[in-house]
């Protein structure tokens, strides 16, 4: 949506490419080494564009750059700088510290041959730039400096082709962080030569002598930008893509066809399409590729301002660090945190890295020979995983089938070639991913750790195909074996799936249980006159606020932090506190329903509610990470193509192609297509744009005399600078949404995923679980057994009298209360989320009660976040920390070597792990980078017949992404995982079809977790459940688990996890290595005898249930002679 009000801004007139010369300062080198992308055998290092690190503090990210010289008038264009810079000289100081991952350059070359990608070829007719001569001309020794280039989006093709002219005479001395640097402008060759004479293959004599041609930079651009863009646009001729981009920026050819004559159409033979379907698919492909290429350039060459993230010196972790060493430690931690998102993009089968295929998924319910409409075509064409069709035969512009030159790829499993393909065969990107894979957790599948141990021993044979036995501890071969079970499967079927992407979140988020329902508008609350004239709207949060105020007044929660703050002296006090809180919640629900009647709020308003959040689409939002800049461009290209499908399908259906050449048809339609697309994606519910107007389009400037400079002289002259375009659209954000209510249709009305099933819950699995665990010792001060064992014995009516439970009658009342609340809550629980604190208990109870009273009975979908944290790991599973090629003759020798290293001070390696975030909304207030699945749905307005977009939050496919995303093991049959939608987040506020049957991968940790949760849920354990958990967890382990592992096993029950970990530590202190149940029972002597007399709580239990265990007979929450307080307020 474009803003109704234009924003007027100004931008300086200067070139859009600069050469920076920095001193080789050790601290700067160490920081850049941590933040940059590099490959040990490549001289170019890709670094982030950050103020006070790689550019000066007052660097302008957007400029009016001179592009054409007409005598005394210069035409300028707006362009913004790419969020990366390229170090190309003096980089040996970086590379000597780089991790060796084997010969990735060779692997990338083989991948290009295998999958028909173009190879970069150095232009032998061009002279490479003499950087030593440039350094000398500015008074610097080339051996003592680092050189890097920053370039605008519009200038990247000029830089690639060596069509930029450095002007040493205009050198500027600037302060970059703590370093004094020199920057030299690079002007477009179009200012000195006729634009018609410029070409990436040939050049004039002036350009040959003066042009800045650095083949190593051109090579990086070729793969990092152009090959990657071509893959996403399904355009394999990278050189033609570069030529088209150069022509578009210089000659303003946005409204002409540039790519279609050279476009080929891949992935079609394997789809078994009819001739008409095939034609429709290719035509739509051509349209959306061309439109996206034109509009991406326009949107990137627009006005963008510096953001907080771009200022390196203002990062909290940099400002708070007292020493340089602390800065490096914090930056390394940040890099590890971000590896969670790298993992998701690599391991998710529906990742943006693999979604390069346009597929025709026909609607089987469509009648035979029925006419194809725009709607049916729009539903049929989808973006999907391309790995299964990388070297199939393809079609050309004349729709002729061309045989593939390379041999067919018979690999059904994900390999190093697929990974290199996902990286656009850019060695620096591939090296970065390998660095992350070397530090990711292993997910075992029945073989324990033997696979990685055996591989390390086999490395001594020096037969590695990637490194030839030079660096097997860190090479790509070892990395892929470590995480082999987590790699995505290559499916032969095409299916509609969301696309997983990593972006930066906006602050706005409306993501509570019912989202937009009952949320009073900001404008409405500010305009009392307008409010008086209309029916007031419901303010749901007013009633939640009443409950929060009650809690603060009664000291149930901390008034500032919102943390639990229950202060009670006895079980009766606790019961009274919770009873009073529940009464307060139910009164608030009653008032809310009364308010709904007054405001005429219907059930439909609830059912149509939306949860939503915004994602930042500005190019500088991910400037801190060159890798995520790489994926950012892919996201923008995919999103624009998805939006262009509406226009493309409409034109293909209404104006069919009758000739042979697709490009000829497209040329006839393109100007109309171009204009139609401009109006089709504004204000349509998904993409938000900002209209920007430049303050002045004509400026008088003292500027370089270009004609004089061409003759070898330098002088400044007064010129008139005219901006070729005054108003433009800028990328702002897009909105991702979710519908909490499942609206059944003909296909889903019997869907079991949302049908509420009545459950008999153990209190430790109910709504009070967090309180029972947290306050166990305070509730039962004399009790010597754990919370879990206590409740298991209560359920079994097997509590020995040798255990001091205090006053028996108080205990009976407390047990009765606990079961009553647990079962009452379960009857109305439509969210199926276990509260983790009082605030979440209040929110869930309020909404469950509200929806239950209104007559809702099915489960809702819910939003959840997994946030990254760093946890220690077993160093034996991380051979990268050996620092040298392994030469071990046996597994035992390797194990002993690692133990020796640990004894000599080797710290446990830290890796990123994901943990459930209790407050989903906090990831947006915490300014997070998030990874999520997105599916852009299109629907037609009944009134206007216009198409609108709905950015649907989707799933992340792939069992290897993270263990928290996988469904429960077979022992726990529920569909909760089908109703929960997850995003992966790292908070930076403090840092900155026919189904193919195949066996699902089950990881060892999931099997253990399933058994542990069965122990917790089971009502028939005859011994302390904590000991059963301990025995299950420690079985077949060669080291103790981390706290993070234990929290995963017990589903986040922190007190229980701590208790089990304390027992493990106690056993470790006693030097116990046998973790069988008999040993555990002998060590923990406080176990009671089964023959001891027991307390009789049988009157609280009733027999005869199907499962064979007791069900508590709870008293009704309302007396029979009283009318429920909520009944009067029902709609």
Curated annotation (Swiss-Prot):
Keywords: DNA replication, DNA-binding, Host nucleus. The keyword Nucleotidyltransferase does not apply. One of its GO terms (cellular component) is host cell nucleus. GO terms for molecular function: single-stranded DNA binding. GO terms for biological process: DNA replication. A motif (Required for filament formation) lies at residues 790-791. It is found in: Host nucleus. Residues 1112-1131 are annotated as: Required for nuclear localization. InterPro entries: DBP_sf, Viral_ssDBP_head, Viral_ssDNA-bd. Belongs to the herpesviridae major DNA-binding protein family. Homooligomers. Forms double-helical filaments necessary for the formation of replication compartments within the host nucleus. Interacts with the origin-binding protein. Interacts with the helicase primase complex; this interaction stimulates primer synthesis activity of the helicase-primase complex. Interacts with the DNA polymerase. Interacts with the alkaline exonuclease; this interaction increases its nuclease processivity. Single-stranded DNA-binding protein required for DNA replication. Plays several crucial roles in viral infection. Participates in the opening of the viral DNA origin to initiate replication by interacting with the origin-binding protein. May disrupt loops, hairpins and other secondary structures present on ssDNA to reduce and eliminate pausing of viral DNA polymerase at specific sites during elongation. Promotes viral DNA recombination by performing strand-transfer, characterized by the ability to transfer a DNA strand from a linear duplex to a complementary single-stranded DNA circle. Can also catalyze the renaturation of complementary single strands. This is Major DNA-binding protein. The gene is DBP.
């Amino acid at each position: 949506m474009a803003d109704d009000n234009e924003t007027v801004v100004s931008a300086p007139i200067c070139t859009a490419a600069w050469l920076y010369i920095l001193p080789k300062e050790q601290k700067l080198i160490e920081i850049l080494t941590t933040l940059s992308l590099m490959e040990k055998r490549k001289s170019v290092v890709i670094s982030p564009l950050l103020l006070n690190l790689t550019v000066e503090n007052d660097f302008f990210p957007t400029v009016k750059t001179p592009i054409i010289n007409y005598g005394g008038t210069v035409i300028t264009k707006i362009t913004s700088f790419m969020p990366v810079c390229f170090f190309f000289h003096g980089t040996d100081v970086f590379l000597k510290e780089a991790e060796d991952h084997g010969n990735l350059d060779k692997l990338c070359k083989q991948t290009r041959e295998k999958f028909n990608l173009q190879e970069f070829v150095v232009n032998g007719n061009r002279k490479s730039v003499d950087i030593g001569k440039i350094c000398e001309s500015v008074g610097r020794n080339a051996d003592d400096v680092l050189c890097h280039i920053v370039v605008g989006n519009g200038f990247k093709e000029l830089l690639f082709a060596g069509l930029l002219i450095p002007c040493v005479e205009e050198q500027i001395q600037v302060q970059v962080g703590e370093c004094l640097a020199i920057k030299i402008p690079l002007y477009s060759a179009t200012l000195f030569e006729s634009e018609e004479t410029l070409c990436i293959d040939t050049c004039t004599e002036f350009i040959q002598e003066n042009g800045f041609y650095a083949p190593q930079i051109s090579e990086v651009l070729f793969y990092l930008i152009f090959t990657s863009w071509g893959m996403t646009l399904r355009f394999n001729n990278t050189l033609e893509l570069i030529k088209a981009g150069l022509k578009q920026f210089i000659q303003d050819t946005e409204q002409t066809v540039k790519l279609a004559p050279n476009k080929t159409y891949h992935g079609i033979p394997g789809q078994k399409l009819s001739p008409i379907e095939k034609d429709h698919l290719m035509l739509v492909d051509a349209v959306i590729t061309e439109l996206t290429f034109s509009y991406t350039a326009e949107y990137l060459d627009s006005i963008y301002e510096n953001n907080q993230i771009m200022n390196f010196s203002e990062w909290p972790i940099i400002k708070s660090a007292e020493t340089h060493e602390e800065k490096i430690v914090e930056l390394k931690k940040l890099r590890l945190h971000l590896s969670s998102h790298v993992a998701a993009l690599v391991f998710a089968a529906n990742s943006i890295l693999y979604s390069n295929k346009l597929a025709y998924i026909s609607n089987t319910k469509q009648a035979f020979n029925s006419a194809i409409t725009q709607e049916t075509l729009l539903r049929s064409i989808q973006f999907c995983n391309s790995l299964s069709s990388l070297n199939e035969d393809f079609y050309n512009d004349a729709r002729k089938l061309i045989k593939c030159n390379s041999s067919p790829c018979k690999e059904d499993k994900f390999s190093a070639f697929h990974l290199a393909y996902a990286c656009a065969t850019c060695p620096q990107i591939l090296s970065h991913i390998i660095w992350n894979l070397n530090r990711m957790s292993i997910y075992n599948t029945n073989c324990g750790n033997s696979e990685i141990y055996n591989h390390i021993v086999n490395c001594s044979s020096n037969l590695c195909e990637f490194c030839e036995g030079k660096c097997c501890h860190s090479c790509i071969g070892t990395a892929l074996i470590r995480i082999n079970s987590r790699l995505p499967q290559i499916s032969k079927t095409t299916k509609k799936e969301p696309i997983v992407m990593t972006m930066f979140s906006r602050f706005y988020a409306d993501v509570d249980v019912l989202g937009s329902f009952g949320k009073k508008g900001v404008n409405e609350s500010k305009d009392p006159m307008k409010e008086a004239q209309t029916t007031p709207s419901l303010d749901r949060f007013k009633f939640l606020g009443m409950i929060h105020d009650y809690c603060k007044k009664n000291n149930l929660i901390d008034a500032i932090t919102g943390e639990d703050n229950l202060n009670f002296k006895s079980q009766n006090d606790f019961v009274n506190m919770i009873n009073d809180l529940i009464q307060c919640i139910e009164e608030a629900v009653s008032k809310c329903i009364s308010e709904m009647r007054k405001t005429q709020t219907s059930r439909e308003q609830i059912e149509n509610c939306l949860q939503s959040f915004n994602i930042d689409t500005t190019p500088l939002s991910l400037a801190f990470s060159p890798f995520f800049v790489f994926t950012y461009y892919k996201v923008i290209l995919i999103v624009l193509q998805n939006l262009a499908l509406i226009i493309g399908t409409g034109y293909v259906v209404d104006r069919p192609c009758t000739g042979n050449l697709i490009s000829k048809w497209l040329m006839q339609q393109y100007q109309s297509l171009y204009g139609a697309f401009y109006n089709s994606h504004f204000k349509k519910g998904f993409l938000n744009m900002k209209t920007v107007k430049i303050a002045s389009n004509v400026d008088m400037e003292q500027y370089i005399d270009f004609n004089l400079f061409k003759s070898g002289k330098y002088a400044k002259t007064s010129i008139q600078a005219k901006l070729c375009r005054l108003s433009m659209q800028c990328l702002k954000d897009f909105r991702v949404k979710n519908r909490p209510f499942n609206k059944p249709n003909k296909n889903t009305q019997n869907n079991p995923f949302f049908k509420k099933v009545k459950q008999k819950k153990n209190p430790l699995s109910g709504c009070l679980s967090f309180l029972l665990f947290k306050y166990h010792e305070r509730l039962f001060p004399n009790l010597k057994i754990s919370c879990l064992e206590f409740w298991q014995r209560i359920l079994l009516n097997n509590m020995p009298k040798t255990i001091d439970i205090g006053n028996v009658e108080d205990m009976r009342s407390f047990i009765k209360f606990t079961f009553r609340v647990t079962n009452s809550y379960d009857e109305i629980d439509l969210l199926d989320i276990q509260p983790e604190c009082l605030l979440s208990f209040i929110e869930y109870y309020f909404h469950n009660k509200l929806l239950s009273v209104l007559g809702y009975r099915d489960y809702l979908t819910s939003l959840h976040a997994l946030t990254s944290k760093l946890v220690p790991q077993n160093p034996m599973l991380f051979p990268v920390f050996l620092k040298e090629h392994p030469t071990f003759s046996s597994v035992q020798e390797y194990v002993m070597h690692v133990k020796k290293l640990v004894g000599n001070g080797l710290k446990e390696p830290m890796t990123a792990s994901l943990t459930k975030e209790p407050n989903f909304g906090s990831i947006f207030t915490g300014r997070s980078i998030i990874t999520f699945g997105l599916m852009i749905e299109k629907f037609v307005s009944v009134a206007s017949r216009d198409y609108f977009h709905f950015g649907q939050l989707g799933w992340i496919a792939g069992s290897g992404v993270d263990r928290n995303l996988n469904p429960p093991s077979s022992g726990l049959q529920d569909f909760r995982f089908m109703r929960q939608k997850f995003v992966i987040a790292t908070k930076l506020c403090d840092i900155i079809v026919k189904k193919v049957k195949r066996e699902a991968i089950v990881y060892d940790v999931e099997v253990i977790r399933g058994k542990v949760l069965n122990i917790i849920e089971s009502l028939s354990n005859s011994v302390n459940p904590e000991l059963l958990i301990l025995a299950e967890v420690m079985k077949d382990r060669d080291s103790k688990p981390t706290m993070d592992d234990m929290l995963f096993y017990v589903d986040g029950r922190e007190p229980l996890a701590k208790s089990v970990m304390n027992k493990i530590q106690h056993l470790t202190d006693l030097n116990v290595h046998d973790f069988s149940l008999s040993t555990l029972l002998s060590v923990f002597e406080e176990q009671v005898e089964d023959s001891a007399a027991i307390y009789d709580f049988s009157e609280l239990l009733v027999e005869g249930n199907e499962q064979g265990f007791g069900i508590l007979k709870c008293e009704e929450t309302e007396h029979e002679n009283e009318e429920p307080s909520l009944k009067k307020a029902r709609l």
